[in-house]
A protein has these predicted regions:
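Beta-lactam-recognizing serine transpeptidase/beta-lactamase-like catalytic domain environment
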Residues: 1-33, 38-227
Length: 227
């Protein structure tokens, strides 16, 4: 696991507190738009919103003194893939309301986001989760704010959504080929396939927020996020 700044373990006494802090496992952060992958997968899995449906994201969402807007407003109706490709906060927030806060929270729990990562070290950060999972909470969580988790937790959850749909708890130990891997089915193969395709578009589409990662000769998929 990479964590910067790092230190020379042969000279531990010369290291700083910051260098010894494991950013990958102990640090918890608001992951930002990376969470839109999870919101998208949950929407598909629960049939809250389909691939062929569109939703209007022309106007910012205003709730009390809060305002949800997009960095590059599209001012039109968009599909689920467009919400992900263009990283729309407005679209993700609308989709979260179709999913519902209780369902969203349930999936976040299945994806290991509500408890520390079950790693074989003491350096595991405790996620900062909402005390109450309200409609506004669901909106902000849909685009990765209002909840803070570790990098390793995020990697495991995204692997489930964009892999084969199974959640596999992260480990630092080499797995024995003779012992079956414990896995939990969170998303169907169809949902995972659709999410993979959309993550590819984030990188391959000329307007995708991740097009800088489109390397010739490789099928790269991903999702940008501002932590």
């Amino acid at each position: 696991l990479a964590s910067l700044p790092d230190f020379n373990p042969n000279h531990l006494m010369l290291s700083t507190d910051d260098a010894r802090f494991n950013q990958a496992t102990k640090g918890v952060f608001e992951m930002g738009s990376v969470f839109k992958v999870l919101n998208t997968a949950i929407a598909l899995e629960t049939n809250a919103f389909g691939l062929n449906e569109k939703i209007d994201i022309s106007d910012p969402i205003r709730i009390s003194r809060f305002r949800i807007s997009d960095y590059h407003p599209l001012k039109r109706a968009v599909s689920l893939s467009e919400i992900l490709v263009h990283s729309s906060n407005i679209g993700s927030a609308h989709i979260s309301q179709l999913i519902g806060p209780e369902t969203q929270r349930s999936y976040m729990k299945q994806l290991g986001m509500l408890a520390p990562a079950p790693l074989e070290i003491a350096e595991t950060g405790v996620p900062l989760i909402p005390e109450k999972w309200t409609n506004i909470t669901a909106m902000t969580v849909s685009y990765g704010y209002g909840i803070s988790v570790s990098l390793v937790q995020t990697a495991a959850a995204i692997s489930a959504a964009g892999g084969d749909g199974h959640y596999i708890a992260p480990t630092l130990l080499k797995r024995s080929p003779n012992v079956p891997i414990e896995r939990v089915r969170v998303f169907s193969p169809d949902t995972a396939k659709a999410v993979r395709s959309m993550m590819r578009l984030v990188v391959a589409h000329k307007s995708g927020t991740g097009n800088f990662a489109n390397i010739p000769g490789y099928l790269v998929g991903g999702k940008t996020g501002t932590a």
